[in-house]
């Protein structure tokens, strides 16, 4: 009966499995609201609420396909409420805000002078942003290169890789009932045009949408000559932004080459130490800021190791250490 009352976006097929996933998400949001209410009640009880600035905003679209990790509006546009520490600025605003704007905004609201420049701009009692920018690159084990720019009316998407689908396999997401339904319909070629495009093996180089009227970005306007001027303007600003601040066109190996000249060597991590305890082992990293993982030799998935955790390997096992800018260390130990 609960599922009958669950509303899902029109582009999803009507399916109880999908509705069940959405119902779980809605209940999580309800629980979150209750927890936020507890924090606000505590602030009021402590006499701190009136002088507290609160930003309350969503995650990037939840785990649903075409939402989280997506460069479309379903993945980028987030609801947000800002509660200031005075009554000078109330009501709704329809200005563009990017997450990089939070740092300068907080400094402005706290009346703290900036000591260095920010990429973002303050939206505290101001409306300074003409465009927002977005990027997608790494999808867990896979990669993509998509960039976007938008103003209040239109969004332009640039696809650096046109030979792979928008869809990227993400193991966590593949466990959802929603993905199992979509995968099944895809195999039967029974998907709607919306998700068929998502699974399509190729992408157009550019996509242009009038997001003020076409929130779900169903109608690519690139083939309409009357939008040529809008396309050229957005493209020019996007190229400028990419040239000034985007290193995504470089492969990860090329980034390393840029970071380390030929006269420099990539620093190495220290070999971790194993400490026998009871029936298992403790891993002593001996490396500041390094992440540690381990797995049995016959396993494909790594387990994240936390300090002072006792591991119980079944047989020979591997330990992996990672720290950005350092050579990855992989060591096999015999039980």
Features from the language model and the residues they span:
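C-terminal cap/loop subdomain of S1 sulfatases and analogous C-terminal strand-loop tails that border
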Residues: 62, 110-207, 259-274
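Active-site beta-strand termini and strand-to-loop segments that position acidic
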Residues: 84, 149-152, 211, 285-286
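Polar, surface-exposed loop/tail segments
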Residues: 50-52, 90-151, 227-232, 236, ...
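Long, internal low-complexity/basic segments
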Residues: 77, 189-206, 211-217, 221-303, ...
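Active-site-proximal cap/lid insertion segments
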Residues: 1-103, 107-117, 165, 170-206, ...
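Residues embedded in well-ordered beta-strands
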Residues: 77-81, 148, 155-157, 293, ...
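Conserved beta-strand positions that form and line the central face of beta-propeller blades
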Residues: 80, 92, 122, 132, ...
């Amino acid at each position: 009966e609960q599922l009958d009352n669950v509303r899902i976006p029109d582009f999803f097929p009507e399916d109880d499995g999908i509705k069940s996933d959405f119902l779980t998400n809605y209940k999580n949001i309800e629980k979150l609201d209750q927890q936020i209410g507890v924090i606000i009640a505590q602030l009021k009880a402590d006499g701190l609420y009136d002088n507290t600035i609160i930003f309350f905003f969503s995650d990037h679209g939840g785990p649903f396909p075409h939402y989280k990790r997506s460069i479309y509006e379903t993945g980028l546009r987030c609801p947000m409420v800002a509660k200031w520490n005075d009554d000078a600025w109330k009501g709704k605003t329809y200005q563009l805000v990017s997450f990089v704007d939070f740092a300068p905004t907080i400094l402005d609201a706290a009346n703290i002078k900036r000591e260095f420049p920010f990429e973002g701009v303050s939206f505290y009692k101001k409306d300074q942003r003409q465009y927002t920018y977005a990027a997608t690159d790494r999808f867990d084990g896979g990669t993509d290169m998509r960039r976007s720019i938008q103003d209040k009316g239109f969004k332009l998407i640039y696809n650096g890789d046109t030979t792979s689908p928008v869809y990227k396999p993400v193991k966590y997401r593949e466990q959802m009932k929603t993905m199992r339904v979509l995968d099944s319909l895809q195999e039967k070629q029974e998907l709607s045009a919306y998700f068929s495009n998502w699974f399509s093996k190729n992408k157009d180089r550019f996509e242009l949408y009038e997001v003020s009227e076409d929130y779900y970005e169903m109608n690519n306007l690139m083939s309409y000559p009357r939008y040529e001027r809008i396309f050229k303007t957005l493209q020019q600003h996007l190229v400028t932004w990419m040239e000034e601040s985007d290193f995504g066109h470089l492969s990860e190996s090329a980034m390393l080459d840029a970071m380390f000249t030929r006269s420099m060597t990539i620093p190495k991590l220290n070999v971790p130490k194993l400490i026998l305890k009871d029936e298992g082992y403790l891993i002593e990293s001996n490396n500041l800021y390094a992440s540690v993982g381990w797995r049995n030799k016959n396993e494909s998935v790594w387990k994240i190791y936390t300090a002072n955790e006792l591991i119980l390997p079944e047989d020979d096992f591997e330990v992996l250490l990672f720290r950005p800018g350092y050579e990855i260390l992989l060591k096999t130990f015999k039980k």
